[in-house]
Amino acid sequence: MREQIYQRPSWDEYFLMIAKLAATRSTCLAFPVGAVIVKDKQVLATGYNGPPSGSNHCTSQGFCYPELSSCDASKALPSRSVHAEANAIAQAAKHGICTNGAIIYVTLEPCIYCLKLIISSGIKEVFYETSFNSGGKAALRDLFIQDGLVSLKQVSLSDTIAKKAATFLLDPTSISKVSR
């Protein structure tokens, strides 16, 4: 029997990596976040946090505050940003893509406002990489979960898959691996 020398990423790792790549498009220096909406193991839409399409980026307007400790702190400051989850849902809507019954992968646990939007768009499962301190809104999040409206699960990349992804990003991909 041939020994398996190639480990494929799990579906969760695969879609989380796509969300992480989407986050690289963010101009938010405080919280670069990416999201990908998936149904039947197919990507429906991606999103990242930033200003609405066609609008100037926060960084180009001098409204970027990378020292913020939370998204809530931006309420006192002029934030132009649309959250990654909302952006992905908007992209799906703009292109007539149904999100009912879909799954979303996000690099940061959704805030309560995005969670309400996710639920309203018919997305039933949320996979996130990093926890978000939702403060006093955690009870509302937990109520949505208890009511069966949505499920949340924290996921991460294994070290092996993260290293493999870094190699793929740094080296030419479509060449024979045997010659390396």
Question: Where are the regions that the model predicts?
Answer:
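Zinc-dependent deaminase catalytic domain
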Residues: 1-180
